[in-house]
Amino acid sequence: MGFAEWRLRNKYWTIYIVPLVVLLLMIYGTWAYCHKLCYERVYRDFGHKATAIGLICTCCVLDALIIAIWVLIVSCGPGHQPGVAPHLLVDSADLENTTVAPNCYQSDPHGYPVWCSNCQSLKVGRTKHSSHQGHCVPRFDHYCVWLGAVIGFKNYRLFVQFVFYFAVLLMIVWITISVYIRDIRQYHARLNANLIVLLIISGIGWLMTSGLFVSYIYYMSQNLTSIEVIDLKKRKRTPELSMQRLYCYYNSDDHYRYVVKLDNDFKGSVYKKHWLKNIKEFMGSNPMLWFIPLPQYWHESPLANGERDVNTIVSPYQEEVGPHTIDYIKKRIESGEYIHKFKEPGREKTHL
């Protein structure tokens, strides 16, 4: 049995092992930092009592904040896209059991949208089916093995906050140990092994979390998810994968739908807008809340409840295609570079 097969069969065990290791390392690091460094060295040996108490309080507050955000990430979840019925794209389709297609959506060469066979629903926007959650996740970003949680539309901001505050904590720990190393060596011939281990762990962790945080700032500014970044890198190595990027667009000028392929000359995210608006789509419209770990709660229903407008059904998970994408598609249509063209009966029927 290969490792990949073993991991798949034992996923319900492995999803707890790594987060448990991370939690134990946090507990060990807090003990080593607060007791071995702050109390035994800074407080007792050097007599810097106010500094030691301040460092201990800062570490404990950040620890509590990080664990609280972790709990919120898992408890809130990534979100659950409501069920969306097929679009009304053919005359023979049942009007009551279909939905009106948005102006632009990802499709196959014939103009049919992406379908999830597990949820029996359309995948709207950047929705992906998550095997860990058992349902479709809106704006699926990735599965974080360190936290044992799927990151998506609903808990994305919490994840960014988790990475940020973890990076701050590790930075404080690493800098504090580095500053006091010389003074400690004057009192003791050997540096405590726990402090050496903590210095290494905090240094590596700081580089990882700070690098991850900077990367996510860039991803958000470009309106990209982690899975899209991986896909873009694959396309650079294998250009033929660009055949998968097909979008169906309703042209209001002639009232036809066109299926257009986004070639490799199309750069960036389909949803890209102004960089600040991109960040607000991920972090929220209020910058004051970007650093406050508050969960986002709203009513979710796995059923469409008879609603036919897709944007209303998936609200508040609705995502708009960027203006530069629309301009690119229109230019392809004007030059005749499209794959398929058809009349959409759904719009005619809904306007009768």
Curated annotation (Swiss-Prot):
How does the record say this protein sits in the membrane? Multi-pass membrane protein
Residues forming the catalytic site = C144
Q: What reaction does this catalyse?
A: L-cysteinyl-[protein] + hexadecanoyl-CoA = S-hexadecanoyl-L-cysteinyl-[protein] + CoA
Query: Where in the cell is the protein located?
Result: Membrane
GO biological process terms, semicolon-separated: protein targeting to membrane
Q: What class of enzyme is it?
A: transferase
Cite the GO molecular-function annotations of the record: protein-cysteine S-palmitoyltransferase activity
Q: Which residues form the DHHC domain?
A: 114-164
Superkingdom of origin organism: Eukaryota
- UniProt KW Transmembrane helix keyword: yes
* UniProt cross-references to InterPro entries, sorted A to Z: Palmitoyltrfase_DHHC, PFA4/ZDH16/20/ERF2-like
Keyword annotations for this protein? Acyltransferase, Lipoprotein, Membrane, Palmitate, Transferase, Transmembrane, Transmembrane helix
User: What's one GO-annotated cellular component?
Assistant: endoplasmic reticulum
Q: What is a single Pfam family found in this protein's UniProt entry?
A: DHHC
Give the EC number(s) listed in the UniProt record. 2.3.1.225
Instruction: Say yes or no: keyword Transmembrane present.
Output: yes
Residue ranges annotated as transmembrane are: 12-32, 53-73, 159-179, 195-215
Its principal location?
A: membrane
Q: Which family does it belong to?
A: Belongs to the DHHC palmitoyltransferase family. PFA5 subfamily.
What name does UniProt use for this protein? Answer: Palmitoyltransferase PFA5
**Which species is the source of this protein?**
Candida glabrata (strain ATCC 2001 / BCRC 20586 / JCM 3761 / NBRC 0622 / NRRL Y-65 / CBS 138) (Yeast)
Q: Taxonomically, what lineage is the organism?
A: Eukaryota, Fungi, Dikarya, Ascomycota, Saccharomycotina
